[in-house]
Amino acid sequence: MKKVVLLSLCFLFFVVFCSSKAFAIDLYGFGSYWDQDDTEGTWGGGIGLNIQLFTEHLRLDGRAYLFEDNDIGHDGDLSITPFDLGLQVHILPSATVDPYILGGVSYIYADSDRFEVDSTVSGYVGIGLDVNLGIPLVKLFGEAIYRAAELDRKIGEDIDASGFTGNVGLKLLF
């Protein structure tokens, strides 16, 4: 239920605050690796949507990840699913190679079958690069993101899920 409410609020935010003269939408999918401090790194993927705000340099960005379960030793597996909402500032939006910075907030849904853990809100910052492939409406992108996140356990030590995330994928431009 929390996921549905969060995604509905994100969608409403996109609709209300995304009025620009050239309404540009990017849909994208990506592969991802998240190297966390207290758990083993994990592979996953995700989907996202970003919308131009006020100028071609500023974009509102929303994304959802799906990672495989994290092995945390004798305590079993931990399932972590981040939902991000943030901004991207593109340096050279019309160039073949467009560097950008990004940052925002994340709702991190956490679950384990062996212990109780609370989901949390955290933040992230990063850099990215869009590369025009010469194919109409398609771009390749890569990102390096640092996510600060600590998950509260009911019993025992908290889990520090902070760490770097690398994303590589394709954007479809509309």
Q: For each predicted feature, which ranges?
A:
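Positively charged n-region of N-terminal signal peptides that target proteins for export
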Residues: 1-4
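Bacterial N-terminal signal peptides
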Residues: 8-16
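Sec/Tat signal peptide C-region and signal peptidase I cleavage site
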Residues: 17-24
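Solvent-exposed loop/turn segments connecting transmembrane beta-strands
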Residues: 34-43, 72-77, 112-118, 154-160
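Gram-negative (and chloroplast) outer-membrane scaffold detector with strong preference
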Residues: 48-123, 131-140, 172
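Outer-membrane beta-barrel porins/channels
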Residues: 138, 142, 147-152, 157
